[in-house]
């Protein structure tokens, strides 16, 4: 016979994705393809897409964690753009990173300037007791 076929020899191992090798959910192969296709550099190393996919996965997980907390605070089970906006703008580092980003349907942070808030007057606190040493007949000239 001519030696065709693979009756003997080692069986090929099951293919394992680079994402699973790195322990990531984000696609390392797709990130690598996009880095090559984007012409960011003439060549792309093997570790670069793994690192970039890990960074993207971490940032996504961080934002989704905070947005999930915002949704739970509002007694909702579904994350909407408003929850993403609240999560990002209330976190100092994420707000700095995504400062120039506009989130559609995100709204604004609730904020009322202190000067616009109603002043707490002494009348709302309660009637003042007369000071010790003054007689009740000597009323002050306060208006």
Curated annotation (Swiss-Prot):
Please describe, based on the UniProt annotation, the reported consequence of changing residue 137 to A.
Increased genomic instability and radiosensitivity
Feature: compositional bias, Basic residues: 7-19
The protein's location, in the record's own words, is: Nucleus; Chromosome
Numbered residues of crosslink Glycyl lysine isopeptide (Lys-Gly) (interchain with G-Cter in ubiquitin): 14, 16, 120
Q: Which Gene Ontology cellular-component terms appear in the entry?
A: centrosome; chromatin; chromosome; chromosome, telomeric region; condensed nuclear chromosome; male germ cell nucleus; nuclear speck; nucleoplasm
GO MF annotations in UniProt: chromatin-protein adaptor activity; damaged DNA binding; enzyme binding; histone binding; protein heterodimerization activity; structural constituent of chromatin
Tissues where this protein is expressed: Most abundant in testis, thymus and spleen.
Highest taxon above the source species: Eukaryota
- Crosslink position(s): Glycyl lysine isopeptide (Lys-Gly) (interchain with G-Cter in SUMO2): 128, 135
Q: Which residues carry this modification: Phosphoserine?
A: 2, 121-122, 137, 140
- Which residues does this entry mark as bearing N6-acetyllysine? 6, 10, 37
- Motif [ST]-Q motif in this chain: where? 140-141
Consequence the record notes for mutating residue 10 to A = No effect on radiosensitivity
Question: Which CDD domains does this chain map to?
Answer: HFD_H2A
- Coiled-coil annotated spans: none
Q: Tell me what else is known.
A: Haploinsufficient for the suppression of genomic instability. This phenotype is further exacerbated in the absence of TP53.
Q: What does this protein do?
A: Variant histone H2A which replaces conventional H2A in a subset of nucleosomes. Nucleosomes wrap and compact DNA into chromatin, limiting DNA accessibility to the cellular machineries which require DNA as a template. Histones thereby play a central role in transcription regulation, DNA repair, DNA replication and chromosomal stability. DNA accessibility is regulated via a complex set of post-translational modifications of histones, also called histone code, and nucleosome remodeling.
PANTHER family per the record? Answer: HISTONE H2A
Q: How does it assemble?
A: The nucleosome is a histone octamer containing two molecules each of H2A, H2B, H3 and H4 assembled in one H3-H4 heterotetramer and two H2A-H2B heterodimers. The octamer wraps approximately 147 bp of DNA. Interacts with numerous proteins required for DNA damage signaling and repair when phosphorylated on Ser-140. These include MDC1, BRCA1 and the MRN complex, composed of MRE11, RAD50, and NBN. Interaction with the MRN complex is mediated at least in part by NBN. Also interacts with DHX9/NDHII when phosphorylated on Ser-140 and MCPH1 when phosphorylated at Ser-140 or Tyr-143.
Q: What does UniProt say about this protein's domains?
A: The [ST]-Q motif constitutes a recognition sequence for kinases from the PI3/PI4-kinase family.
Protein family: Belongs to the histone H2A family.
Protein's name according to its UniProt entry: Histone H2AX
């Amino acid at each position: 016979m001519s030696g065709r076929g693979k009756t003997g020899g080692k069986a090929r191992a099951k293919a394992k994705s680079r994402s699973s090798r790195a322990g990531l959910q984000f696609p390392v192969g797709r990130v690598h393809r996009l880095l090559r296709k984007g012409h960011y550099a003439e060549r792309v190393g093997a570790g670069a897409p793994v690192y970039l996919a890990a960074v993207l996965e971490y940032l996504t997980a961080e934002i989704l964690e905070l947005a999930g907390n915002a949704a739970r605070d509002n007694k909702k089970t579904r994350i909407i753009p408003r929850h993403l906006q609240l999560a990002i703008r209330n976190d100092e580092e994420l707000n700095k990173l995504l400062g120039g980003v506009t989130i559609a349907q995100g709204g604004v942070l609730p904020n009322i300037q202190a000067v616009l808030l109603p002043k707490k007057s002494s009348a709302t606190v309660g009637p003042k007791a007369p000071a010790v040493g003054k007689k009740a007949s000597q009323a002050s000239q306060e208006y």
